[in-house]
């Protein structure tokens, strides 16, 4: 036996409104914000129609559900504006990478540290990568000393998020701003 295809009901975004509200009685708040009390859904729909506005479900889980007479278009627009504002104010934290060698010169080190501090001021995380070449692999302690020196210098403005670890010929440490 073949079963007929039953498509899922289309889901609407936002609160239920007007005829979508399927309860016999509701708690009504009119357009002026006055609580009209417990009324039938038909009376509430008539009042909304007379006002030229929509009946919108504000609190569906209350008993009876709370509905308000307002302009649904304005409500959706305000919600979109609020969401856009929240997205605009969101800061994406990036991970900036600083590459060094274990036998870095003092001036080069200072230049790299200036960049590290600038990244922390911008609110970004910093991944310090030490690359070992050739026989430098025999002197891992120099790399650890360098990473510890960096850690001490930025201790007031940053915290260690990932302890120094060795991966192949590289030693890495991740720092995050405080």
Curated annotation (Swiss-Prot):
Q: What is the lineage of its organism?
A: Bacteria, Pseudomonadati, Pseudomonadota, Alphaproteobacteria, Hyphomicrobiales
Name the family.
Belongs to the IF-3 family.
Entry's Gene Ontology molecular function annotations: ribosome binding; translation initiation factor activity
Give the source's domain of life in one word. Bacteria
Family matches, as Gene3D superfamilies? Translation initiation factor 3 (IF-3), C-terminal domain, Translation initiation factor 3 (IF-3), N-terminal domain
Oligomer and partners: Monomer.
Name the Gene Ontology biological process terms. ribosome disassembly
Gene symbol? infC
Tell me, in one coarse class, where this protein mainly resides.
cytoplasm
The name on file for this protein is Translation initiation factor IF-3
Query: Would I find Protein biosynthesis among this entry's keywords?
Result: yes
Q: Residues annotated as region Disordered?
A: 1-20
């Amino acid at each position: 036996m073949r079963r007929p295809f039953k498509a899922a009901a289309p889901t609407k975004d936002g609160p239920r409104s007007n005829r979508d509200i399927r309860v016999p009685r509701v708690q009504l708040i009119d357009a002026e914000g006055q609580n009209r009390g417990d009324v039938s859904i038909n009376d509430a729909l008539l009042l909304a129609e007379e006002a030229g506005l929509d009946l919108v479900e504000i609190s569906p889980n209350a008993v009876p559900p709370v509905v308000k007479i307002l302009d649904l278009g304005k409500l959706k627009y305000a919600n979109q504006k609020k969401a856009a504002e929240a997205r605009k104010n969101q800061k994406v934290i990036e991970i900036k990478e600083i590459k060094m060698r274990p036998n870095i010169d003092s001036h080069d080190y200072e230049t790299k540290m200036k960049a590290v501090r600038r990244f922390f001021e911008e609110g970004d995380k910093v991944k310090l990568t030490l690359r070992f070449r050739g026989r430098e692999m025999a002197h891992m302690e120099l790399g650890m000393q360098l990473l510890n020196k960096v850690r001490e210098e930025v201790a007031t403005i940053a915290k260690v998020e990932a302890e120094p670890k060795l991966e192949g010929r590289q030693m890495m440490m991740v720092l995050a701003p405080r």
